[in-house]
């Protein structure tokens, strides 16, 4: 029973880590893709040090 509980805890911890790692908010978009990336957000695309910023 304790092995099953340990396995369930490991699987849950891995799911939480994957959710944090694959967070789309941390997505880095280059300057070339910046206008398309900001297009649907009604924002003005600017590029600072090679990183896209969508300024509302």
From Swiss-Prot:
Keyword field contains Disulfide bond: yes
The keyword Disulfide bond is annotated on this UniProt entry: yes
Free-text tissue specificity from the UniProt record: Expressed by the venom gland.
Entry's Gene Ontology molecular function annotations: ion channel inhibitor activity; potassium channel regulator activity; toxin activity
UniProtKB keywords: Calcium-activated potassium channel impairing toxin, Disulfide bond, Ion channel impairing toxin, Neurotoxin, Potassium channel impairing toxin, Secreted, Signal, Toxin
SUPFAM superfamilies with a match to the protein in the record: Scorpion toxin-like
Intracellular or extracellular location(s): Secreted
Entry's Gene Ontology cellular component terms: extracellular region
Signal peptide limits: 1-28
A Pfam match: Toxin_6
Coiled coil: none
Disulfide partners: 31-47, 34-52, 38-54
Protein family per UniProt: Belongs to the short scorpion toxin superfamily. Potassium channel inhibitor family. Alpha-KTx 09 subfamily.
Domain notes: Has the structural arrangement of an alpha-helix connected to a beta-sheet by disulfide bonds (CSalpha/beta).
Protein name: Potassium channel toxin alpha-KTx 9.1
Source species of the chain: Olivierus martensii
């Amino acid at each position: 029973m304790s092995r099953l509980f340990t396995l369930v805890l490991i699987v849950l911890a891995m799911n939480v880590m994957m959710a944090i790692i694959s967070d789309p908010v941390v997505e880095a978009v280059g300057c070339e893709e910046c206008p398309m990336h900001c297009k649907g957000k009604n924002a003005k695309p600017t590029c600072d040090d090679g990183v896209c910023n969508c300024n509302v």
